[in-house]
Amino acid sequence: MTDQLKRAISAAQTAQINDQQAEATRIASSSAGDQTFDMSESSYKTSHTAIRKARRFAMQGLYEWLVTDRRFDIDGKLGWKANAPHDIAARTRATNAMHTVHIGYYHEMMRDIPEQIDALNTLITQQLDREINKLDTVEHAILLIGAYELQNRLEIPYKVVLDEAMKLNNHFGATDAHKLINAVLDRMAVELRAPEIEADSKANLRTSQKAAAKPALKTDNSTNNNADIDTTTVAEKPTASNKPRISANNTSVKRNSASKALANISDYKASKQNDAQNMVEESIIKPASIEPVIADKANAFAASAENIVNHQPVEENVPASNDVNDNTTSLAEVELLDSNSVDVDIKGVDIKNIDVKEDASESVELNDADAKNQD
């Protein structure tokens, strides 16, 4: 047998002996109630989520311990105790991916809560209206974790402890169990965290007073603003100004000057005067257009009279000449009547023209007066 083979056999024998010794130590410690945890982890998660997951695994481990070894211990069946808390923790780590769990806090709860079980049960019983053995096992495990954190982990606020207990009950507890858990832990917090609760109540009182004072200040400011607005509206009256007004959309200066208003008024007057003159020119009939008509009529009557005289025979007697004279006189009278009627018509037209001119002048004067009043 070579030396290398001898060394391998001796190493296997020493390893077997070491395993036997470790098993014997484990059995002895579990029977004696001693718990040994490996707390040398330095790379486990320490965030709030990791601590929450540690609570969940601890609640499951405590539930398993309460229904096995703890029950056997109460019943006096010590020979049945074969499920120590450290064994539960070891199996949990071996069968679950716990790389996102706060391993140190998980092992701490699995070690300290079973060691302090009697003191924690006393705290819980003081706030219960029933015996603790009548509690559901899940509710009992949640209350143990909450009581442990309220008593030993003072760095965790009591509101966080109550909130995490409610979340554990939502995952594992009964429907209405949150009422009992919340009531027990709230009363327990009043006893164990009295300074914290007092400080929290004072802070809440200050915030409520500030919140109540803010609307009053706002109303006072609003009334002052309304008063300022009223005084400014009374004091400031709209007055005409010749200052340039600059538009926000256009950088050019817009001037509301008096010259622009006067120019608009003068244009309005000129347009009214032109309209009046056009009306007068359309309504007036010029005498020059009437005179050729009168002359034509007179020439026609004279020509007709000459024709009548020239065509009469010489041999006619005196009555014939009298008839001619009568005809000529009648023609002359007709001409006079026509001329008189034409003169009357011309005079009537002139009178109408004069009336139209007077109306036009009066309308122009009224427009001028209105424009002055507007200025």
Swiss-Prot record:
Molecular function as annotated in GO: RNA binding
A Gene Ontology biological process term: transcription antitermination
Coiled-coil residue spans: none
Segments passing through the bilayer: none
Family, per entry: Belongs to the NusB family.
Start and end residues of each stretch annotated as Disordered: 25-44, 203-255
Keyword DNA damage: no
Identification of the protein by name: Transcription antitermination protein NusB
Keywords annotated in UniProt: RNA-binding, Transcription, Transcription antitermination, Transcription regulation
Keyword Transcription found: yes
